[in-house]
């Protein structure tokens, strides 16, 4: 796993590509797993249905708190700390061999004049690219020659870096997921044919109209009461009516429909550029042409390094001091023993969440697999014998000896249809009889046309 870091002249604290890949995919893999757990729980307890309906908002709200906690006390995100990584901010990019990255390489290719092939030294753009890659490797080898000097050039992330990191870790993935979901829903062929979206829009408009009507009726009922509280309530309801009218207007506006059409045409290209940019950075990181695994790290000028013993000890000191300060803060409160226990439990949950969360998902999936295996391997009961066929009622039609004949028309059956009593007739014959008499012509058992079932026979 770490074999890419054993080469001579390389930074031993630089995470391998597989470490970066695993930590980058860790949190997105938790999201569907946790949603599945709450979906199963909501089927047994309706209280969890609210979490399922607003799962994205609940998930990213908790993720915001979790990531802030780890960025503040562990110098890295939840998944980065799980793989013993930390965020550092290099003071000098060139000293770390990152001055020549994707942007500088593109600049060299784009800014290269068209007459670059003329003169005493003729270089094509492919040669410039090769020389740029060679320069990157030389800079990296020179920078890693003195590890102590390299550590002095790094500094811890600040509060501004943590806030900016929360935008890239939580807000952007949230809005990206919402845009993907909206595009998938609106680009559905059924929605384009008006079989999905139009019905939803009509239902939404009907709900808005009903809400407006209910609010107007409530205002009229309270018009006769002169009270300051009632007046304030009426004002709030009037504002809500105006807001609902605005929503109804926006949903039916042509401008919004044009913007929606433009979005459906442009968003696939924007999403492709977004994914391609991540792929290019990951490819460059794999071949050690950059120390930035994602463009977000490049925008922030932040790199990931492995934790050393000094970092782990400093984290322990910070955590112990934090717990002591919080306990001392609530010790003077009334009922301090309860709050002291609560603070200790919350701190333990946050600090050990990197073990609790994966373990809980693993245990749940293991239990699900165990019970599903038991259901599959459990002895199955024998198939119950079919009930005996109904007997002919006195005065009922005779059953023909030739099974291919219809008891009603006494001709070979066409479009065979079975009745609730178990006898087969022609569809036109049995439909007309049941529609008129509401009973089986042989057994006189009550039936209706909805209980008739067509049979498709093989030739």
Swiss-Prot record:
Subcellular location: Peroxisome membrane
Keyword check for Mitochondrion: no
Superkingdom of origin organism: Eukaryota
Segments on the Cytoplasmic face: 45-47, 197-248, 381-459
Gene Ontology annotations for the cellular component aspect, listed alphabetically: peroxisomal importomer complex; peroxisomal membrane
Membrane topology note: Multi-pass membrane protein
Peroxisomal matrix side: 1-16, 73-158, 288-355
InterPro entries: PEX12 (IPR017375), Pex_N (IPR006845), Znf_RING/FYVE/PHD (IPR013083)
Transmembrane region(s): 17-44, 48-72, 159-196, 249-287, 356-380
Main location: membrane
Entry-linked Pfam families: Pex2_Pex12
MF terms (GO), sorted A to Z: ubiquitin-protein transferase activity; zinc ion binding
Zinc fingers typed RING-type, residue spans: 406-444
Keywords: Membrane, Metal-binding, Peroxisome, Protein transport, Transmembrane, Transmembrane helix, Transport, Ubl conjugation pathway, Zinc, Zinc-finger
Keyword Cytoplasm: no
Single GO BP term: protein monoubiquitination
Pathway assignment: Protein modification; protein ubiquitination
Record-listed Zn(2+) binding positions: 406, 409, 426, 429
Known partners and oligomeric status: Component of the PEX2-PEX10-PEX12 retrotranslocation channel.
Domain notes: The three subunits of the retrotranslocation channel (PEX2, PEX10 and PEX12) coassemble in the membrane into a channel with an open 10 Angstrom pore. The RING-type zinc-fingers that catalyze PEX5 receptor ubiquitination are positioned above the pore on the cytosolic side of the complex.
Function: Component of a retrotranslocation channel required for peroxisome organization by mediating export of the PEX5 receptor from peroxisomes to the cytosol, thereby promoting PEX5 recycling. The retrotranslocation channel is composed of PEX2, PEX10 and PEX12; each subunit contributing transmembrane segments that coassemble into an open channel that specifically allows the passage of PEX5 through the peroxisomal membrane. PEX12 also regulates PEX5 recycling by activating the E3 ubiquitin-protein ligase activity of PEX10.
Family: Belongs to the pex2/pex10/pex12 family.
Name listed for the protein in its UniProt record: Putative peroxisome assembly protein 12
Gene for this chain: pex12
């Amino acid at each position: 796993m770490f074999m890419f870091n054993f080469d001579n002249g390389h930074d031993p604290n630089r995470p391998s590509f597989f470490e970066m890949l695993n930590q980058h995919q860790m949190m997105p893999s938790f999201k569907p797993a946790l949603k599945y757990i709450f979906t199963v729980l909501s089927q047994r307890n309706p209280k969890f249905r609210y979490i399922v309906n607003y799962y994205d908002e609940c998930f990213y709200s908790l993720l915001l708190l979790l990531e802030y906690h780890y960025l503040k006390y562990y110098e890295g995100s939840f998944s980065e700390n799980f793989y013993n990584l930390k965020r550092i901010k290099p003071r000098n990019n060139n000293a770390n061999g990152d001055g020549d990255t994707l942007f500088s390489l593109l600049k060299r290719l784009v800014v290269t004049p068209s007459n670059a092939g003329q003169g005493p030294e003729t270089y094509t753009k492919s040669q410039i690219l090769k020389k740029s890659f060679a320069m990157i490797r030389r800079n990296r080898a020179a920078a890693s020659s003195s590890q102590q000097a390299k550590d002095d050039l790094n500094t811890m992330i600040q509060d501004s870096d943590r806030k900016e990191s929360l935008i890239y870790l939580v807000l952007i993935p949230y809005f990206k997921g919402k845009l993907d979901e909206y595009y998938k829903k609106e680009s559905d062929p059924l929605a384009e044919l008006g079989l999905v979206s139009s019905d939803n829009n009509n239902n939404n408009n009907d709900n808005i109209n009903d809400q407006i009507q209910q609010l107007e009726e409530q205002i009229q009922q309270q018009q006769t009461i002169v009270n300051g509280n009632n007046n304030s309530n009426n004002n709030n309801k009037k504002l809500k009516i105006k807001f609902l009218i605005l929503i109804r207007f926006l949903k039916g506006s042509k401008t919004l429909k044009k913007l929606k059409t433009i979005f459906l045409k442009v968003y696939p290209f924007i999403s492709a550029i977004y994914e391609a940019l991540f792929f290019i950075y990951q490819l460059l990181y794999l071949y050690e042409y950059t120390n930035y695994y994602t463009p977000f790290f490049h925008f922030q000028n932040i790199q990931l390094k492995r934790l050393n013993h000094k970092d782990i000890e400093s984290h322990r000191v910070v955590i112990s001091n934090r717990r002591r300060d919080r306990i001392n803060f609530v010790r003077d409160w009334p009922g301090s023993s309860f709050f002291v226990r609560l603070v200790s439990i919350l701190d333990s949950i946050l600090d050990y969440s990197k073990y609790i969360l994966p373990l809980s998902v693993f245990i749940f999936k293991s239990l699900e697999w165990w019970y599903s295996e038991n259901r599959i391997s459990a002895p199955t009961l024998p198939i119950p014998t079919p009930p005996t066929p109904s007997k002919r009622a006195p005065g009922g039609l005779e059953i023909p000896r030739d099974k291919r004949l219809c008891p009603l028309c006494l001709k070979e059956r066409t479009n065979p249809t079975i009745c609730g009593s178990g006898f087969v007739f022609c569809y036109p014959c049995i439909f007309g009889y049941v529609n008129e008499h509401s009973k089986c012509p042989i057994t006189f058992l009550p039936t209706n046309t909805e209980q008739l079932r067509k049979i498709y026979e093989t030739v």
